[in-house]
Amino acid sequence: MPNQDILDLQPAHIRELQNRYERAMADHGYDSLLIASGAAPYRYRDDQAYVFQGFGPFLHWTGLAGQEHSWLLVRPGQKPVLWLYQPVDFWHANPVMAEEPWLEVVDVRSRQQSGAPELDSPGRLVVIGDPLVLDGVPGDHNPAALVAAVEEARVRKTPYEIECLAHANRIALAGHRAAREAFLAGDSEFGINLAYQQATGQREVEAPYHSIIGLNEHAGTLHYQYYDLKPPRRPRSLLIDAGVRYRGYCSDITRTTAGPDEPRFTALVHGLEKLQLRLCEMVSPGVDYVDIHRKAHLGIATLLSASGLVSGLADEAMVEQGITRAFFPHGIGHFLGIQVHDVAGKPTPSPEDAPFLRLTRTLEAGMVVTIEPGLYFIPSLLEPLLNGPEAQYLNRALIDELKSCGGIRIEDNVVVTAAGARNLTRECE
């Protein structure tokens, strides 16, 4: 059952979206905006379709992630109109719409046809969505400037969106607890995934992204995508990066657990968690997100030195020489919302020293970001250092000892508030 406090925020959310989208339309000279939910394409020479989760702007208004062939019309000063595709079909069931407050401020209509609805006097019409479903639809299709404005309208979350994200964190954390218990009980990656799904009540196809569940050296593959059916003989580590989708909104949480007889790796996990919490505390209006990324590298350097993995170099020198990038190759995080890697995060390119950073903006109240430092033992990144002039600073024996633990990543979902930050993940633990 949805939380009534969340439901009570729905009408104000729709009204705010109406205001934001009306401004975008006015700025670009449009009278009507039609949004397509999209549809899953079929596999080549097959009658099975790919998994479908819906177009971001459609979810922004409705939260209906699995609703194909549906359309939403936005016009200034008028109720939004939602056409839901609900065919008479004995093969499949149509989704049942619960009576909720947002339906009072949206005109919802059922229709049998999958194509775009015919509009009366739309004026200058713009249509956005997957080009595969827009063929033959009148109007301007996906103009770049209007699409950018609509994506910018998603950057600062409404109170409704923030509470949906908070609830998505609560559900996901139940899964993370179950996954940790399954690991400590000796389960396999496959079994841990089942435990996560059971605890979250979410099917794999409903997840916002494929859950990353890596034991031992698999934790060193950043987006490890397979699940071994058998557990390793010696379970040394678990890295699980997994979220849920709630009413269209995603959580994205990562936790790392050391095995019971891994004191060195346990110390690294604890050290990285302390760093991660300090980085979360940096989140505040006016802070350049790139600065958080750079502080993360200095923190990783301190941890490498304290653990004995690297010695004989100052922290700044470790960063300048690229040593920290071999241990921490990805960005510190990204925007979060309807999409896991939410839109409009890079108005400027990633800096040269952070090529994989997905967010390069100055933080503002209402933004939601992830903070996810990592420390990994990835052979393809470490071998060039171990075989180069930097080898004199690296503890090869300790690296070899920890290599089969794979790596560590710790990730929280954080709201930028007027006064600082609200950590949605930690408040639910």
Curated annotation (Swiss-Prot):
Q: Which reaction does it catalyse?
A: Xaa-L-Pro dipeptide + H2O = an L-alpha-amino acid + L-proline
Gene Ontology terms describing biological process? proteolysis
What keywords does the record list, in alphabetical order?
A: Dipeptidase, Hydrolase, Manganese, Metal-binding, Metalloprotease, Protease
In this chain, Mn(2+) 2 is annotated as bound at 241, 252, 411
Cite the EC number. 3.4.13.9
Superkingdom classification of source: Bacteria
Kindly state what the record says about how the cofactor is bound. Binds 2 manganese ions per subunit.
The terms under GO molecular function for this entry are: aminopeptidase activity; metal ion binding; metalloexopeptidase activity; phosphoric triester hydrolase activity; proline dipeptidase activity
Query: What Gene3D superfamilies is this protein classified in?
Result: Creatinase/methionine aminopeptidase superfamily (3.90.230.10), Creatinase/prolidase N-terminal domain (3.40.350.10)
Q: Name one Pfam family in it.
A: PepQ_N
Q: Which SUPFAM superfamilies match?
A: Creatinase/aminopeptidase (SSF55920)
Q: Which residues form the signal peptide?
A: none
One cellular-component annotation, GO? cytosol
What cofactors are annotated for this protein? Mn(2+)
Key word Nucleus present in the record? no
List of residues binding Mn(2+) 1: 252, 334, 372, 411
UniProt family annotation: Belongs to the peptidase M24B family. Bacterial-type prolidase subfamily.
* Role description: Splits dipeptides with a prolyl residue in the C-terminal position.
Name of the protein this chain belongs to: Xaa-Pro dipeptidase
The encoding gene: pepQ
